[in-house]
């Protein structure tokens, strides 16, 4: 691996700004690393090498002229395949969109380009972001760089694997029920799910509109802080976007543990023992440093997964109705009959998991079952929000493992969707409540597989969230050794 890619993100940024390395050198190192390891990892669906090199050369030219667009000018960032980039295929890892080229940029893409970031599209994902393992892609299964026989998490597994394998220093994913945090946990990364509405969803292909959020990945915390500072902010093109004071990365300071009230949860027998051990180790260190640990009752949140899957699949059923072979999506016209065109296009275009969720959502929205399922789920969602409000009247943050286990083997849970859904047991409630949360590395198990810790804070407290994450990174046993050789 090129020595450049061994540098921490902050050192890479400083080296670009000081002229120690050029963007062309950095981008070339990324391309060579992708050529070297992505045949095994399969993080990228496609990369236009010529285009990214041209962008890097333009960045270097700006710096030579003393006109860099920002301190990030020339920094590579990978983009998940459901975030639109003009004149670039945005397939959502689905056959139905395999030839769709977006005619516009997503807002987050515009913001990245304005700052001079070099875009590396497109990273693999679960089809239409529906999955927890990236096994549901219509094109390939992404593998975990720590163990190629295991999953990287999902649905943003391609973005997470690309960063963990040192192909790129930064990446964007999307999080509907844990799709940034869970892959971050399983790949040893920092991964942020922002407060709902603080990052524009314009140009993000919708799965569940009331739950989706775009979020960053990085091997170091500062990468997530910097990306969030760039992509956050009000956007008039997104009706759910919220106006807030501009977040500044320079305002983030390490949180003093003394007097910090930390909500903690009780571990249950089905949680992997090494996850419990790592969690307990963190809590013991916090107690020693003066934090107050407050037990919170998470028993009601056992309903979060069924609530989430009723609401998410209902919104999925509505959002994906546009992919019919006429408005959007590949057209399969075998008989010349309009109804057959719809059926054939969707039958051949969607994969099994997407079809399953469309059916679930259509059922819960049907006239005879709407109140019993969707209506009840929305009432329960409001109760989850109130429960979090109650928690945060007593604590400053909640700490819990991001995932109940480390990365499982490819194919281990594909035949049992319920077991797959349970991987999101601690992440879905955060999306239902619209809260900010972040997965941070919490060491590794005996096999060297990463374990993640989830930090949750009240709405709009990303600054505090980052401060807590920064302080946690100094604790014993939190660091991850990333693999250099991947075979």
UniProtKB/Swiss-Prot annotation:
Keywords: ATP-binding, Ligase, Nucleotide-binding, Protein biosynthesis
GO biological process: translation
Pfam families: Amidase
Gene Ontology cellular component annotations, sorted alphabetically: glutamyl-tRNA(Gln) amidotransferase complex
Catalysis performed (reactions): L-glutamyl-tRNA(Gln) + L-glutamine + ATP + H2O = L-glutaminyl-tRNA(Gln) + L-glutamate + ADP + phosphate + H(+)
MF-aspect GO terms: ATP binding; glutaminyl-tRNA synthase (glutamine-hydrolyzing) activity
Keyword Cell wall biogenesis/degradation applies: no
Top-level EC class as recorded in UniProt: ligase
Active site feature: 80 (charge relay system), 155 (charge relay system), 179 (acyl-ester intermediate)
EC number: 6.3.5.7
Signal peptide range: none
Coiled-coil ranges (or none): none
Keyword Glycoprotein: no
PANTHER family: GLUTAMYL-TRNA(GLN) AMIDOTRANSFERASE SUBUNIT A (PTHR11895:SF151), TRANSAMIDASE (PTHR11895)
Job description of the protein: Allows the formation of correctly charged Gln-tRNA(Gln) through the transamidation of misacylated Glu-tRNA(Gln) in organisms which lack glutaminyl-tRNA synthetase. The reaction takes place in the presence of glutamine and ATP through an activated gamma-phospho-Glu-tRNA(Gln).
Similarity remark: Belongs to the amidase family. GatA subfamily.
Record note on quaternary structure: Heterotrimer of A, B and C subunits.
Name of the protein described by the UniProt record: Glutamyl-tRNA(Gln) amidotransferase subunit A
UniProt gene name: gatA
């Amino acid at each position: 691996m090129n020595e450049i890619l061994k540098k921490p993100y902050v050192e890479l940024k400083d080296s670009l700004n000081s002229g120690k390395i050029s963007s062309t050198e950095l981008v070339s190192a990324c391309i060579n690393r992708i050529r070297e390891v992505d045949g095994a990892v399969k993080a990228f669906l496609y990369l236009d090498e010529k285009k990214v090199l041209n962008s890097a050369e333009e960045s270097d030219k700006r710096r030579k002229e003393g006109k860099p667009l920002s301190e990030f000018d020339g920094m590579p960032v990978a983009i998940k395949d459901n975030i639109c980039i003009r004149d670039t295929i945005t397939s959502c890892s689905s056959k139905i969109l395999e030839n769709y080229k977006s005619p516009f940029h997503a807002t987050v893409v515009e913001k990245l380009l304005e700052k001079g970031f070099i875009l590396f599209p497109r990273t693999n994902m679960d089809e239409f972001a529906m999955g927890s393992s990236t096994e549901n892609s219509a094109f390939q299964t992404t593998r975990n760089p720590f163990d190629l026989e295991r999953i990287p998490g999902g649905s943003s597994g391609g973005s997470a694997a690309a960063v963990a394998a040192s192909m790129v220093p930064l990446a964007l994913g999307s999080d509907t029920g844990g799709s940034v945090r869970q892959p971050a946990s399983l790949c040893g990364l920092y991964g942020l799910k922002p407060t709902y509405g603080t990052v524009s969803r314009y140009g993000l292909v919708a799965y569940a509109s009331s739950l989706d959020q775009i979020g960053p990945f990085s091997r170091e915390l500062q990468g997530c802080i910097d990306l969030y500072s760039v992509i956050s902010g009000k956007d008039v093109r997104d009706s759910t976007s919220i106006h807030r004071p501009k977040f500044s990365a320079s305002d983030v300071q390490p949180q003093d543990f003394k007097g910090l009230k930390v909500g903690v949860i009780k571990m249950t027998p089905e949680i992997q023992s090494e996850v419990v051990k790592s969690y307990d180790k963190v809590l013991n260190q916090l107690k020693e440093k003066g934090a107050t640990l407050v037990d919170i009752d998470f028993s009601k949140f056992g309903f979060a997964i069924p609530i989430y899957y009723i609401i998410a699949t209902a919104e999925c059923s509505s959002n994906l109705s546009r992919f019919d072979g006429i408005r959007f999506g590949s057209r399969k016209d075998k008989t010349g009959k309009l109804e057959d065109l719809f059926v054939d296009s969707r039958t051949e275009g969607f994969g099994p998991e997407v079809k399953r969720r469309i059916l679930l959502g259509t059922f819960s929205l049907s006239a005879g079952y709407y109140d019993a399922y969707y209506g009840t789920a929305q009432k329960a969602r409001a109760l989850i929000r109130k429960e979090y409000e109650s928690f945060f009247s007593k604590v400053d943050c909640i700490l819990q493992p991001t995932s109940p286990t480390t990365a499982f083997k490819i194919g281990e849970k594909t035949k049992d969707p319920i077991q797959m859904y349970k991987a999101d047991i601690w992440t879905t409630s955060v999306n239902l409540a619209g809260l900010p949360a972040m997965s941070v590395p919490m060491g590794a198990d005996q096999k060297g597989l990463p374990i993640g810790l989830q930090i949750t804070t009240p709405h709009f407290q990303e600054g505090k969230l980052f401060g807590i994450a920064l302080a946690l990174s100094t604790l014993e046993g939190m660091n991850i050794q990333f693999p250099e050789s991947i075979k």
